[in-house]
Amino acid sequence: MKYASWLTLSVTAFACAGCGGKNTESAVETSGADKTAKTQVLEAGAAVMQNREPLEALNAYIDGFHFYNGNIKGQMEAHHYCALLNEDVTQCVIYDGNTAHSKLMGVEYIVSAKLFAGLPAKEKHMWHSHVQEVRSGQLIAPGIPEFAEKEFMRKFAGTYGKTWHTWHTDQDKELPVGSPMLMMGFTKDGQADEAMIAARDKRFDTSSAENRENRADIDYPAIDPDADAWQKGIVIQLRAIDLKGTEGAETHGAPSP
């Protein structure tokens, strides 16, 4: 799809940013005191006076499902608010709901098949494909017309995502404690919890089954064999270690302790 057409869909999604939302509350209440009147006034002033261009660039809303890498039973709904950086790269912030009190669960970076093909195999092991999410009808773009959603999904089907969750509200955690977790997406029918899908479909007045039928004519690409590595028993997660005195530890360019 040409950039202009994709941009048109993005504008459509932005115009409907308030559509298909406000129907999913956060899974937890946050620990801490209620906002004082002073805090609310300061917050309101900041909202009016400060620049928020990075937030305003989040012009696409996608709702889908993730599971913990290595634990397919640990499944949850994920509300993605995304900015299309260019034709090949999209970045999303992920919430556990779509209301003002939703918790920021994590992030997902999405790249085209062209860019993904150039990544090292070990890097690819941390990424998941999107073919099944689209083909199953379980991935939706709430609030935009059906034709626009289908074109959105046609492009999305060939992409790959790298997702980290940092606040595990599905485990009833009131604070973002614990290690960040690498997440994956479903790759076959029967993997997703049917009750979870049905509950989401009811809230959004959609049907994953009907979505699947509507997307049957999408030309789904072959999946890179190094993606979805959990299917081959390659499971990657972070482990907390004390870097002090640890030789060979990867610090990503951070200053030495």
Where are these regions (language model features)?
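Bacterial N-terminal signal peptides that target proteins for export
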Residues: M1-L7
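Generic detector of short alpha-helix boundary/capping microenvironments
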Residues: L7-T8, C82
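C-terminal motif of bacterial Sec signal peptides marking the signal peptidase cleavage site
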Residues: A15-G18
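N-terminal domain-onset segments
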Residues: G20-V89, T159-P257
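Extracytoplasmic c-type cytochrome modules immediately beyond a signal peptide or single-pass transmembrane anchor
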Residues: A47-V48, R52-S112, F116-P120, H125-Q132, ...
